[in-house]
């Protein structure tokens, strides 16, 4: 009887220990997790369990236009997805901590340029990098798992200098030496710069390219 009981309880204990050992990522009520590198997320969530190690996760700010309204008749305001890169050990609970947003003006302003930090189980800051992605089309139709997969693949190739990132303590801008790039790399870099530029910069780029 004891052997039978052990056979049933041991897998449950091991499964429980495995679940407890996962890295847990939590976001506040006005943020949501869209995609994670090591698992497929079918619906945006506020909490997710991740394996130990390096993480790449897509999140976004998503708040009622009026943060104090119960009916939400004014709709929601969302930011562009933000790619977060960080590392964590088994058993850690990593929390995304953002400043308080109280007014409609604050919500709209914050959605354009979200700011936050990551903390660990002890409440200490977790080092991370973040990059705001520009996704065209309707957010409802976007496949964020595919979008993240493209970013993960690009980061592993390392054929081109990485885009500027915002860290927990500083903001840096990558410097590119065009002379060190192959023609194919230079062509791809020009395409990336054009696609990520705003309308004004694109017009100036076209005028420069045409010699106007």
UniProtKB/Swiss-Prot annotation:
UniProt keyword terms in alphabetical order: Signal
Disulfide partners: none
Record carries keyword Cell inner membrane: no
InterPro entries: UPF0319
Leader peptide range in chain numbering: 1-21
Presence of keyword Ion transport: no
One Pfam family it belongs to: DUF2057
PANTHER family: UPF0319 PROTEIN YCCT
Family: Belongs to the UPF0319 family.
Protein name: UPF0319 protein PBPRA2789
Organism field: Photobacterium profundum (strain SS9)
């Amino acid at each position: 009887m004891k052997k039978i009981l052990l056979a049933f309880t041991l897998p449950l204990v091991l499964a429980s220990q495995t679940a407890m050992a996962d890295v847990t990522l939590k976001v506040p009520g006005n943020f949501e997790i869209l995609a994670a590198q090591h698992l497929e997320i079918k619906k945006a969530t506020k909490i997710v369990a991740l394996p130990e190690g390096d993480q790449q996760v897509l999140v976004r700010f998503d708040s009622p236009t009026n943060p104090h309204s119960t009916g939400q008749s004014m709709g929601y305001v969302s930011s562009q997805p933000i790619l977060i890169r960080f590392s964590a050990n088994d058993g850690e609970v990593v929390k995304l901590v953002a400043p308080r947003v109280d007014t409609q003006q604050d919500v709209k302003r914050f959605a354009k340029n979200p700011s936050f930090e990551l903390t660990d189980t002890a409440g200490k800051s977790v080092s991370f990098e973040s990059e705001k992605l520009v996704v065209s089309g309707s957010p409802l139709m976007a496949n964020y798992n595919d979008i993240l997969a493209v970013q993960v693949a690009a980061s592993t190739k390392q054929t081109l200098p990485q885009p500027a990132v915002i860290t927990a303590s500083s903001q840096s801008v990558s410097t590119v030496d065009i002379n060190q790039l192959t023609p194919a790399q230079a062509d791809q870099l020009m395409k990336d710069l054009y696609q990520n530029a705003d309308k004004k910069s694109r017009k100036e780029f076209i005028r420069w390219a045409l010699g106007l």
